[in-house]
Protein backbone atom coordinates (compact mmCIF):
# COMPACT_ATOMS: atom_id res chain seq x y z
CA UNK A 1 0.00 0.00 0.00
CA UNK A 2 2.80 2.43 0.86
CA UNK A 3 4.38 1.79 -2.54
CA UNK A 4 1.09 2.56 -4.24
CA UNK A 5 0.79 5.81 -2.28
CA UNK A 6 4.24 6.85 -3.46
CA UNK A 7 3.41 6.02 -7.04
CA UNK A 8 0.22 8.04 -6.93
CA UNK A 9 2.22 11.04 -5.76
CA UNK A 10 4.52 10.95 -8.76
CA UNK A 11 2.26 12.39 -11.45
CA UNK A 12 3.66 15.87 -11.65
CA UNK A 13 3.34 18.62 -14.18
CA UNK A 14 5.97 19.50 -16.70
CA UNK A 15 9.02 20.90 -14.98
CA UNK A 16 8.13 23.86 -12.77
CA UNK A 17 10.66 26.66 -12.59
CA UNK A 18 12.67 26.86 -9.37
CA UNK A 19 13.36 30.12 -7.56
CA UNK A 20 16.71 31.74 -8.35
CA UNK A 21 18.52 31.42 -5.03
CA UNK A 22 22.15 31.62 -4.01
CA UNK A 23 23.12 28.99 -1.46
CA UNK A 24 26.35 27.59 -0.05
CA UNK A 25 27.78 24.78 -2.16
CA UNK A 26 27.55 22.50 0.87
CA UNK A 27 25.78 22.90 4.22
CA UNK A 28 27.07 20.01 6.35
CA UNK A 29 25.49 18.64 9.51
CA UNK A 30 21.99 19.04 10.87
CA UNK A 31 22.68 22.48 12.32
CA UNK A 32 24.27 23.63 9.06
CA UNK A 33 21.25 22.43 7.11
CA UNK A 34 18.91 24.26 9.47
CA UNK A 35 20.87 27.52 9.13
CA UNK A 36 20.80 27.39 5.35
CA UNK A 37 17.09 26.56 5.19
CA UNK A 38 16.39 29.49 7.50
CA UNK A 39 18.21 31.73 5.01
CA UNK A 40 16.09 30.35 2.16
CA UNK A 41 13.04 31.98 3.73
CA UNK A 42 14.63 35.35 2.96
CA UNK A 43 14.34 34.49 -0.73
CA UNK A 44 11.33 32.15 -1.01
CA UNK A 45 7.87 32.00 0.53
CA UNK A 46 7.62 28.26 0.99
CA UNK A 47 10.23 25.64 1.84
CA UNK A 48 8.93 22.21 0.83
CA UNK A 49 11.00 19.81 2.92
CA UNK A 50 10.48 16.28 1.63
CA UNK A 51 10.96 13.31 3.91
CA UNK A 52 11.58 9.60 3.66
CA UNK A 53 8.69 8.34 5.76
CA UNK A 54 9.48 7.18 9.30
CA UNK A 55 13.18 8.02 9.06
CA UNK A 56 14.60 9.45 12.27
CA UNK A 57 17.27 11.47 10.51
CA UNK A 58 14.67 13.42 8.58
CA UNK A 59 12.82 14.04 11.84
CA UNK A 60 16.00 15.38 13.43
CA UNK A 61 16.51 17.83 10.56
CA UNK A 62 13.02 19.32 10.72
CA UNK A 63 13.00 19.55 14.50
CA UNK A 64 16.36 21.35 14.42
CA UNK A 65 14.88 23.73 11.87
CA UNK A 66 11.81 24.68 13.92
CA UNK A 67 13.93 24.97 17.07
CA UNK A 68 16.33 27.41 15.41
CA UNK A 69 15.86 30.77 17.18
CA UNK A 70 15.31 32.58 13.88
CA UNK A 71 12.60 30.23 12.61
CA UNK A 72 9.61 31.85 14.37
CA UNK A 73 10.93 35.27 13.37
CA UNK A 74 10.44 34.35 9.72
CA UNK A 75 7.85 31.58 9.60
CA UNK A 76 4.48 31.37 11.34
CA UNK A 77 2.91 28.45 9.46
CA UNK A 78 3.75 24.79 8.95
CA UNK A 79 1.69 22.41 6.79
CA UNK A 80 2.14 18.67 7.33
CA UNK A 81 1.01 15.49 5.62
CA UNK A 82 0.54 13.69 8.93
CA UNK A 83 -2.48 15.65 10.18
CA UNK A 84 -6.02 15.94 8.84
CA UNK A 85 -7.89 19.14 8.12
CA UNK A 86 -10.89 17.77 10.01
CA UNK A 87 -8.94 17.72 13.29
CA UNK A 88 -7.52 21.23 12.91
CA UNK A 89 -9.18 22.51 16.12
CA UNK A 90 -7.57 19.70 18.13
CA UNK A 91 -4.17 20.36 16.59
CA UNK A 92 -4.50 24.09 17.23
CA UNK A 93 -5.26 23.51 20.90
CA UNK A 94 -2.30 21.18 21.33
CA UNK A 95 0.19 23.38 19.48
CA UNK A 96 -0.74 26.47 21.48
CA UNK A 97 -0.22 24.59 24.76
CA UNK A 98 -3.72 23.60 25.88
CA UNK A 99 -4.35 20.33 27.67
CA UNK A 100 -5.05 17.67 25.06
CA UNK A 101 -5.19 13.99 25.95
CA UNK A 102 -3.05 11.46 24.11
CA UNK A 103 -6.18 9.84 22.69
CA UNK A 104 -7.43 13.19 21.39
CA UNK A 105 -4.09 14.08 19.84
CA UNK A 106 -3.86 10.72 18.08
CA UNK A 107 -7.03 11.57 16.17
CA UNK A 108 -5.02 14.25 14.36
CA UNK A 109 -3.18 11.58 12.37
CA UNK A 110 -5.59 8.67 12.76
CA UNK A 111 -8.22 10.56 10.75
CA UNK A 112 -5.93 11.05 7.74
CA UNK A 113 -6.51 9.18 4.50
CA UNK A 114 -3.32 7.20 5.14
CA UNK A 115 -4.17 6.14 8.69
CA UNK A 116 -4.82 2.53 7.68
CA UNK A 117 -1.13 2.17 6.80
CA UNK A 118 -0.14 2.95 10.39
CA UNK A 119 2.57 5.12 8.91
CA UNK A 120 1.93 8.12 11.16
CA UNK A 121 1.88 6.03 14.34
CA UNK A 122 5.67 6.25 14.35
CA UNK A 123 6.55 8.48 17.35
CA UNK A 124 8.66 10.84 15.24
CA UNK A 125 5.47 12.56 14.04
CA UNK A 126 4.11 13.19 17.52
CA UNK A 127 7.64 14.32 18.43
CA UNK A 128 7.42 17.03 15.80
CA UNK A 129 4.16 18.37 17.19
CA UNK A 130 5.69 18.33 20.67
CA UNK A 131 8.72 20.28 19.45
CA UNK A 132 6.57 23.03 17.93
CA UNK A 133 4.44 23.15 21.08
CA UNK A 134 7.60 23.59 23.13
CA UNK A 135 8.87 26.38 20.86
CA UNK A 136 5.51 28.15 21.17
CA UNK A 137 5.61 27.92 24.96
CA UNK A 138 8.53 30.36 24.90
CA UNK A 139 6.90 32.83 22.52
CA UNK A 140 4.27 35.54 23.05
CA UNK A 141 0.82 34.60 21.80
CA UNK A 142 1.02 36.85 18.73
CA UNK A 143 4.34 35.34 17.62
CA UNK A 144 3.49 31.65 17.83
CA UNK A 145 3.71 29.10 15.05
CA UNK A 146 0.58 27.43 13.73
CA UNK A 147 0.64 23.89 12.32
CA UNK A 148 -1.95 23.00 9.68
CA UNK A 149 -3.04 19.53 8.68
CA UNK A 150 -2.83 19.06 4.93
CA UNK A 151 -4.60 15.71 4.59
CA UNK A 152 -8.30 16.09 3.71
CA UNK A 153 -9.48 13.51 6.25
CA UNK A 154 -12.86 11.72 6.32
CA UNK A 155 -15.79 13.25 4.50
CA UNK A 156 -13.60 15.44 2.31
CA UNK A 157 -13.45 14.28 -1.31
CA UNK A 158 -10.46 16.39 -2.26
CA UNK A 159 -7.14 14.71 -3.00
CA UNK A 160 -4.30 15.09 -0.52
CA UNK A 161 -2.41 17.44 -2.82
CA UNK A 162 -5.45 19.58 -3.61
CA UNK A 163 -6.21 19.94 0.10
CA UNK A 164 -2.63 20.90 0.92
CA UNK A 165 -2.47 23.50 -1.83
CA UNK A 166 -5.78 25.01 -0.67
CA UNK A 167 -4.41 25.41 2.86
CA UNK A 168 -1.21 27.00 1.57
CA UNK A 169 -3.04 29.45 -0.65
CA UNK A 170 -5.64 30.47 1.93
CA UNK A 171 -3.48 30.54 5.04
CA UNK A 172 -0.08 31.53 3.66
CA UNK A 173 0.34 32.80 0.11
CA UNK A 174 -2.74 35.01 -0.07
CA UNK A 175 -1.57 36.59 3.18
CA UNK A 176 1.96 37.13 1.85
CA UNK A 177 3.29 34.94 4.62
CA UNK A 178 5.82 32.08 4.70
CA UNK A 179 5.48 28.38 5.46
CA UNK A 180 7.41 25.18 5.98
CA UNK A 181 5.73 22.20 4.31
CA UNK A 182 6.55 18.61 5.32
CA UNK A 183 5.39 15.75 3.09
CA UNK A 184 6.82 12.65 1.55
CA UNK A 185 9.40 13.77 -1.00
CA UNK A 186 7.45 12.45 -4.00
CA UNK A 187 4.83 15.15 -3.47
CA UNK A 188 7.47 17.82 -4.12
CA UNK A 189 9.08 16.56 -7.32
CA UNK A 190 9.08 19.24 -10.00
CA UNK A 191 8.99 16.70 -12.83
CA UNK A 192 8.21 13.04 -13.42
CA UNK A 193 8.10 10.60 -16.36
CA UNK A 194 5.40 11.38 -18.91
CA UNK A 195 3.92 7.89 -18.57
CA UNK A 196 2.53 8.86 -15.18
CA UNK A 197 1.29 12.34 -16.01
CA UNK A 198 -1.72 11.22 -18.03
CA UNK A 199 -3.08 8.98 -15.27
CA UNK A 200 -3.23 11.32 -12.31
CA UNK A 201 -5.71 14.04 -13.18
CA UNK A 202 -5.16 17.14 -11.10
CA UNK A 203 -2.60 15.60 -8.76
CA UNK A 204 0.49 16.92 -10.48
CA UNK A 205 2.52 17.52 -7.33
CA UNK A 206 2.22 20.18 -4.65
CA UNK A 207 5.11 22.27 -5.96
CA UNK A 208 3.87 22.17 -9.54
CA UNK A 209 0.36 23.13 -8.43
CA UNK A 210 1.67 26.09 -6.45
CA UNK A 211 3.84 27.24 -9.35
CA UNK A 212 0.76 27.81 -11.50
CA UNK A 213 -0.42 30.77 -9.43
CA UNK A 214 2.70 31.61 -7.44
CA UNK A 215 5.71 30.97 -9.68
CA UNK A 216 9.14 31.05 -8.09
CA UNK A 217 7.82 31.11 -4.52
CA UNK A 218 8.54 27.50 -3.50
CA UNK A 219 11.90 25.88 -2.75
CA UNK A 220 11.79 22.08 -2.99
CA UNK A 221 14.17 19.88 -0.97
CA UNK A 222 14.31 16.09 -1.32
CA UNK A 223 16.30 13.42 0.54
CA UNK A 224 18.90 11.39 -1.34
CA UNK A 225 20.75 8.35 -0.05
CA UNK A 226 19.48 5.30 1.82
CA UNK A 227 20.35 1.69 2.26
CA UNK A 228 17.65 -0.22 0.34
CA UNK A 229 16.82 -3.86 -0.20
CA UNK A 230 16.25 -3.63 -3.94
CA UNK A 231 14.92 -6.17 -6.43
CA UNK A 232 17.35 -7.12 -9.21
CA UNK A 233 15.39 -5.08 -11.75
CA UNK A 234 16.17 -1.79 -9.99
CA UNK A 235 19.32 0.21 -10.63
CA UNK A 236 21.45 0.26 -7.47
CA UNK A 237 22.59 3.84 -6.70
CA UNK A 238 26.33 4.45 -6.75
CA UNK A 239 26.60 6.94 -3.90
CA UNK A 240 30.35 7.15 -4.44
CA UNK A 241 29.54 9.66 -7.19
CA UNK A 242 28.03 11.96 -4.58
CA UNK A 243 30.80 11.33 -2.07
CA UNK A 244 33.61 12.08 -4.53
CA UNK A 245 32.03 15.38 -5.55
CA UNK A 246 31.64 16.64 -1.98
CA UNK A 247 34.38 18.32 0.03
CA UNK A 248 32.83 17.62 3.42
CA UNK A 249 32.79 14.16 4.94
CA UNK A 250 29.98 15.10 7.32
CA UNK A 251 26.53 13.64 6.72
CA UNK A 252 23.82 14.71 6.25
CA UNK A 253 24.68 17.62 3.98
CA UNK A 254 22.43 20.01 2.07
CA UNK A 255 23.47 20.31 -1.58
CA UNK A 256 21.94 22.67 -4.18
CA UNK A 257 20.82 20.61 -7.16
CA UNK A 258 21.62 23.31 -9.70
CA UNK A 259 25.28 22.73 -8.86
CA UNK A 260 27.36 20.43 -11.06
CA UNK A 261 27.80 17.48 -11.09
CA UNK A 262 24.73 16.90 -8.89
CA UNK A 263 22.41 18.70 -11.30
CA UNK A 264 23.03 16.10 -13.99
CA UNK A 265 22.85 12.93 -11.87
CA UNK A 266 19.95 10.84 -13.15
CA UNK A 267 16.72 10.36 -11.29
CA UNK A 268 16.73 6.74 -12.43
CA UNK A 269 19.85 6.08 -10.38
CA UNK A 270 19.28 8.24 -7.32
CA UNK A 271 15.48 8.25 -7.09
CA UNK A 272 15.05 4.87 -8.75
CA UNK A 273 14.23 2.94 -5.54
CA UNK A 274 10.76 4.50 -5.75
CA UNK A 275 8.98 1.45 -7.10
CA UNK A 276 5.91 0.55 -9.12
CA UNK A 277 4.94 -2.96 -8.05
CA UNK A 278 1.55 -3.16 -9.76
CA UNK A 279 2.48 -4.53 -13.18
CA UNK A 280 2.97 -8.15 -14.31
CA UNK A 281 6.75 -7.72 -14.54
CA UNK A 282 7.30 -7.27 -10.82
CA UNK A 283 8.68 -4.17 -9.11
CA UNK A 284 10.39 -1.66 -11.38
CA UNK A 285 11.62 1.87 -10.83
CA UNK A 286 9.11 4.53 -11.84
CA UNK A 287 12.09 6.30 -13.43
CA UNK A 288 13.30 3.30 -15.43
CA UNK A 289 14.56 4.57 -18.78
CA UNK A 290 13.84 8.20 -17.86
CA UNK A 291 16.28 10.96 -18.80
CA UNK A 292 15.16 13.16 -15.91
CA UNK A 293 17.93 14.53 -13.71
CA UNK A 294 18.00 15.50 -10.05
CA UNK A 295 18.32 19.13 -11.09
CA UNK A 296 14.93 18.85 -12.80
CA UNK A 297 13.37 17.11 -9.82
CA UNK A 298 14.10 19.55 -7.00
CA UNK A 299 16.09 22.61 -5.93
CA UNK A 300 18.26 20.96 -3.29
CA UNK A 301 18.75 17.64 -1.57
CA UNK A 302 19.63 16.46 1.90
CA UNK A 303 22.24 13.84 1.11
CA UNK A 304 22.64 11.24 3.84
CA UNK A 305 25.03 8.82 2.16
CA UNK A 306 24.64 5.10 1.70
CA UNK A 307 24.81 4.03 5.34
CA UNK A 308 21.38 5.12 6.55
CA UNK A 309 18.91 2.28 7.04
CA UNK A 310 15.69 3.27 5.29
CA UNK A 311 13.45 0.67 6.86
CA UNK A 312 14.67 1.22 10.40
CA UNK A 313 14.01 4.92 10.05
CA UNK A 314 17.44 5.80 11.40
Question: PLM features: what roles do these ranges have?
Answer:
Residues 16-314:
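Compositional signal for N-terminal targeting/processing segments
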Residues 3-13:
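Bacterial N-terminal signal peptides
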Amino acid sequence: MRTLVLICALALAATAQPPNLRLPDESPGIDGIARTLISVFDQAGIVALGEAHQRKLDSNVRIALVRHPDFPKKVRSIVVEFASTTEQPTLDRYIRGDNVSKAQLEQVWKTTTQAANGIWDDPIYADFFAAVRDVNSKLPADARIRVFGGDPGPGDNRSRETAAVAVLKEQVLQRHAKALVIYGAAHFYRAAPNDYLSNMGQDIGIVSMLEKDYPGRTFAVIPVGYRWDLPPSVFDPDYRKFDRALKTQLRPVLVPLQRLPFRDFTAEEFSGPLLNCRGPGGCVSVFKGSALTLGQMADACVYVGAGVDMKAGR
